[in-house]
């Protein structure tokens, strides 16, 4: 590498500033990490992956992957919004047992404050169940999660998912139909956010990208 090229690379790093990536207030507003950029607008739209363990310090939550998206810059802080979560596949595989059934439901739900969230719920039975019992359990999931979402804000709903309150309540209702070993909210994804013009896709585009388009 020529000395001139090394100088250019060095100068580019000198131009960069470090920004503190901050979790939403619903996750305590803690620092998720830091990232460099020569232009803060380049950070907008970037997705940050972490785990619930990194936020709470509880090692039993290391399998819960969280996704936050940078939506704005405030001074040297990159502010984020919850984008979704997913349980580690190895963890989900460890829950599966022979001679039992797995019932999955995917629902697009509306929160009280106008967000639309796609939720994937998985119920694992103690024994193998029949088709009609699976349908009944899936119906319990649907009725419960639609009602619950309509009563809570997005932040409240996400916290009840993370605390296993929703999983436990669904399991309790489903056990009236068939023995349930476990219920997990396997995955969530933010689809729509409220706006004065009505719900709009939860897509964050960097101002730089918008100008290029």
Swiss-Prot record:
InterPro entries: Ribosomal_eS1, Ribosomal_eS1_arc, Ribosomal_eS1_CS. The keyword Ribonucleoprotein applies. One of its GO terms (cellular component) is ribosome. Keywords: Ribonucleoprotein, Ribosomal protein. It comes from the Archaea. One of its GO terms (biological process) is translation. GO terms for molecular function: structural constituent of ribosome. PROSITE patterns: RIBOSOMAL_S3AE. The keyword Thylakoid does not apply. Belongs to the eukaryotic ribosomal protein eS1 family. This is Small ribosomal subunit protein eS1. It comes from Desulfurococcus amylolyticus (strain DSM 18924 / JCM 16383 / VKM B-2413 / 1221n) (Desulfurococcus kamchatkensis).
